[in-house]
Amino acid sequence: MKIMLFSLVLVGFLNSAYAHHSFGYHFDVEAEVTIAGTVKEFKFINPHAQVLVDVTGEDGQIETWTCEFRGANGLARTGWREDTFRPGQAIELTGFAARRRDTECYFDHAVMADGTRISQDGPLGGDLYAESASAETSAIAASGDVPNFTGVWGQAPGMGAGMGAGMGRGPTLGGPNRFEWVLSNAGQRALEAYDPIVDDPSIHCKPPSLTRLWGTGNPTQITQEDELFTIHHEWLDVVRNVYLGLSEHPEGIADRVMGHSIGWYEGSTLVIDTVAYEPSVLFQFPGLPTSNQLHTVERLTLSEDGRNFDISWTAEDSAYFTEQLSGNSRPLQRLNTTLQPYNCTPMEVA
């Protein structure tokens, strides 16, 4: 059996690890582990792909390790495929140790029997989902009085995933909750009842909030009609309809995961007003709970050349917040790719 565990200094580590959950809550960034064994199975799934490796101990007993990656859709855009790892292959794998299970890790790189080194963030080939149109021809500037957001958008390749609100790489385990100050007494009680390890909605394939949707590493497709603006986030297959023909929200709307949205144009900006949310969290880590009184306003502002747009937002919650919160997400650019079904597989946590 070959298993090595030691500390390391981390510099600029794995931005993509934050695409779906806060890395530090599940894995130890200061503990690197290396295992050697045989590939048992490669699960090319979302939100996290997994490779299962059988490691034979000194006593001859086989122990199966599970090491996870970012999601299959993101991997496919850097050349990964379902058969990148095949059962029976000899593998030496290096990753970062899980905090709660001794035989789990987060994949960093692997060395195969022929000496090939495979890195999660190193491209293995072309984008499986790339369109034939070039980025130059797909960039469309605003037309007439209505800014043209139609197309596929996402973060620039290599940017990793943001957490919204200028939060960078995401909070660390045991770190301060930078937004706790906004919570009312009721909000504080909701925070005390929230466990980010097991209650994170995305673990259960449910989108937590608009800030997370805009901050993932997966693309978003927008279509525009006269009275409907549709935002299709590849992550978790979320589709949001923004009704442009309404001046106010209808009465008696049932609460829903992503609320009810109306919108209007202000020059090169689309303003999205959303109410009737189900209770959730604005940020999963360490947690910022929201009630069904949450009211958000997003502003999507298209650049002059039509190739990028900025995202800013405000959030009010008369039940859980004492003041309004505001923030922004990383700008998105037009992408030369197509959306794919996400088909989220719920995660097991302990």
Could you describe each region identified by the protein language model?
Residues 4-16:
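Bacterial N-terminal signal peptides
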Residues 11, 19, 238-240:
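Short, compositionally biased strand/turn segments
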Residues 17-24:
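Boundary at the C-terminal end of the N-terminal hydrophobic targeting segment
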Residues 24-350:
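PEST-like low-complexity, intrinsically disordered acidic/proline/serine-rich tracts
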